[in-house]
């Protein structure tokens, strides 16, 4: 296998060449590839292949051998212009490797001029030259892990589009007019009108967002419903002390005429915020929101009380008979024991009075509740750190009661809250609780929490992930890649049958057990309730794997998982990503417009599978249209036996013991396994009820954990 560079030359600039003054240059270039050889006369370069004359803005291929150089000569057809430069192909390939497989540079020519050169790195099975020297140098596109991204969650309240925001300067809430405390993303800010608020004040916003308050829908709404139409009387004002805008919450800058002040209510705003302030002069939004909430709760209580009467005044409904009345009342009263236990470990277990309320529960349920409330991080010994990120850390832990080993994923509550990922965390827990129904999904034992952290206790898969293994062998052979792809298909189809779109399929998230079977992990990006014609439009995923319909802002369904599956198979078979770019903008353009490169040595069935997976029309993509199991690449697969794990994997990872960590990145294993410190002020002010339904134990694992 020999790597090669696909090179393009363009944009020749002759500079200040005297011979070019007043003349049309009309240049052309000649490319001479020379080999380094040792001779009796010493070291020298010899040209073994014919000279190439590539047209401008076209491409040509040059294979990489150590010592091989490329001489580029530019000549003029109409003038005496000769410029040249020499490029070492090995150094150019190294530059491409550091820039995600491609590079773009200006070449300075001698004696004058310059030109733009684009180069892209590829692998090909055409030369028989030994590639060991290049393997040692790491000429591969898959040389680092890639993190997922997700569009900020948008809270739509009264036409506002609030997103969690980090305020780099002191900011005040436009609802309660108090300071927005905290680190990271302290509060919400509207993307349309820039109104800043506390996260806790989002339910107290009564003014609709329109960008302008003059004759706005919001003003008309209050005028018709509440008879409120009080425009502010703003006038330019000179502030003698630091003052904050009561709309966007930031400081009014300047020495004079810094902002506007309302003569009636004294509201202070920026000049730029004047047109975005609602006509609510003299109205306290916080108090009005509380009053409206009280009225609503009073009306609900009154309607509930009225429903208990047999006859009603006004428009008459048929009176409910006594038997119906008795049947409808109990659902209004919470049933003891039916509510999911809080599971907060710093609380003491339920006392006897709570246990005696209501009918006695089965013995298994009581054991589960007791264990769920008592389980804490001190029940585990943290041996190694397997990975970490902005979310938290993953540990290899030993359960003290049974001396069994688990992988514990610890999330920091303050980070989850700041990133507005509470619901994503709950989705991950629910998907993991379903994983026991399928052999190729990571199984979760239980979840519990402390005041600072959330913990997922999962099976420890000591075979490592596919990204770790592909970095050592650079690509998988056809039988191995086909086996992994088939097991991933079964896992994806199970998730899709449950109405779950995975949205983060990549090498990093495919783990191996000790026998060599795959397990899909990390369900934090999943979307639930996607059965039938349901679609979503959240922008999320790992950049290299994102489907074009996501980039185009279109609504999508499980079709995006089959595009990501195509990228996964391409990387397993070829050893590099199908789409490239120096930054995300170029990468996304490549995903939308470019066709992947297929080496000549790629098997016909594998290429056909990839072509059908990389169809940009979601409804025509394989997996959405047609049965992917029937593709010729999988003709040797017995799907029933595969799902029962009756087929031996082609590769078995080296595992020395149940707690072996040799298949994980060494950079994490060397760190001390300990929990990160949380923001104490934020933790103390946090509403812990947001995580009240987090704690969970899988019923199928009660005996194992309690033994």
From Swiss-Prot:
Residues 380-634 form the Protein kinase domain. Its cofactor is Mg(2+). Residues 327-365 are annotated as: Disordered. Keywords: ATP-binding, Cell membrane, Cytoplasm, Immunity, Inflammatory response, Kinase, Magnesium, Membrane, Metal-binding, Nucleotide-binding, Phosphoprotein, Repeat, Serine/threonine-protein kinase, Transferase, Zinc, Zinc-finger. It catalyses: L-seryl-[protein] + ATP = O-phospho-L-seryl-[protein] + ADP + H(+); L-threonyl-[protein] + ATP = O-phospho-L-threonyl-[protein] + ADP + H(+). Residues 1-107 form the C2 domain. Its EC number is 2.7.11.13. Autophosphorylation at Thr-219 is required for targeting to the TCR and cellular function of PRKCQ upon antigen receptor ligation. Following TCR stimulation, phosphorylated at Tyr-90 and Ser-685. This is Protein kinase C theta type. The gene is Prkcq.
